[in-house]
């Protein structure tokens, strides 16, 4: 809403008010709604508001408002631009994803021991809040009585379920979909209070160390709100460099829209270092994989690297689909 207050009720025949929009808004359908002609007369307070339904993600600044008036015959016109900077951040879109399926997938897969059968014979190393799907035998009754909340034993295997997410910032017409899917995965993982680190390397290098909780989520979403497709180095180089710094068990997730030889090399880097690896390839719709991409998928699957092609607006059960 734009409000103009006048000290003196001088009669105005008309008033043209235009809110100058950021350049990113040029393609918005509602762009003409930022300009209005009013007939204020003697009113001291003049207001108008408009709504932009679709705003691109990013940091946007509304810098100024242009006001114009004149007489009935057009012999006199007066135009003034007021500087009223206002900056706000638009977070990326996201979709609710059932992250629990990721743990089930690795527990059933060939890349790790079957935790379901091993937990009973494993020494617990701590306690945590109960989660749906936890066994009755895992409940720590002493901790439950002490905290008045149902507490579950935490095992060493569970602590090894750290996630390391890489976003491919290579220029692509599907980059916005890559950002949306990445934001969805990050949110799903951290909302389950699972530790996650995030690596985003383009013209600038942004790395969020292993952590969990809402603060980590907000920081990563803030970065994804402003991230650009400006990759300078191959993703495989970033993966290899970052994995050299990590010694604890970690599951690597790569998000891309183009399953290139470099992405294959990045997945191989993770596998060589005995890291579990999942590759998500974002496409607009089905049957858009090239012959090269299909060949790379077959090669990676032979190396027990999990690959899943995901499509726009169909992200909800991506982990469940991989585990089939």
PLM regions: where:
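Exposed, interaction-prone extracellular/peripheral surfaces
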Residues: 132, 136-324
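An amphipathic, basic-hydrophobic helix/alpha-beta surface used to engage anionic
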Residues: 1-211, 251-255, 269
């Amino acid at each position: 809403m734009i409000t103009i207050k006048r000290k003196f009720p001088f009669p105005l025949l008309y008033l043209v008010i235009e809110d100058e929009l950021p350049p990113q808004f040029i393609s918005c359908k509602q762009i003409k709604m930022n300009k209005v002609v009013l007939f204020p007369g003697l009113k001291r307070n003049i207001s108008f508001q408009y709504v932009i339904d679709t705003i691109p993600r990013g940091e946007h600044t509304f810098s100024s408002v242009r006001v114009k008036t004149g007489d009935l015959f057009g012999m006199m016109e007066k135009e003034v631009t007021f500087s009223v900077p206002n900056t706000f951040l638009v977070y990326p879109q996201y979709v609710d994803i059932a992250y629990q399926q990721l743990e089930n997938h690795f527990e059933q897969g060939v890349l790790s021991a079957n935790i379901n059968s091993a937990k009973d014979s494993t020494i617990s190393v701590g306690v945590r809040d109960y989660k749906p799907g936890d066994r009755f035998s895992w409940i720590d009754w002493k901790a439950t009585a002490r905290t008045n909340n149902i507490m579950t034993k935490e095992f060493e295997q569970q602590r090894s379920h750290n996630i390391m997410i890489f976003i491919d910032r290579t220029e692509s017409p599907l980059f916005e979909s890559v950002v949306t899917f990445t934001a969805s995965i990050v949110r799903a993982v951290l909302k389950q209070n699972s530790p996650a680190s995030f690596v985003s390397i383009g013209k600038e290098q942004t790395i969020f160390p292993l952590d969990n909780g809402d603060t980590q989520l907000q920081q990563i979403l803030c970065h994804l709100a402003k991230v650009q497709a400006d990759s300078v180095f191959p993703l495989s180089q970033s993966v290899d460099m970052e994995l050299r710094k990590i010694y604890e068990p970690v599951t690597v997730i790569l998000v891309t829209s183009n399953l290139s030889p470099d992405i294959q090399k990045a997945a191989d880097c993770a596998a060589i270092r005995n890291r579990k690896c999942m590759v998500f390839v974002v496409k607009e719709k089905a049957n858009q994989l090239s012959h090269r991409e299909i060949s790379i998928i077959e090669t990676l699957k032979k190396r027990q690297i999990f690959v899943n092609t995901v499509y726009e607006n169909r992200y909800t059960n991506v982990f469940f689909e991989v585990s089939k």
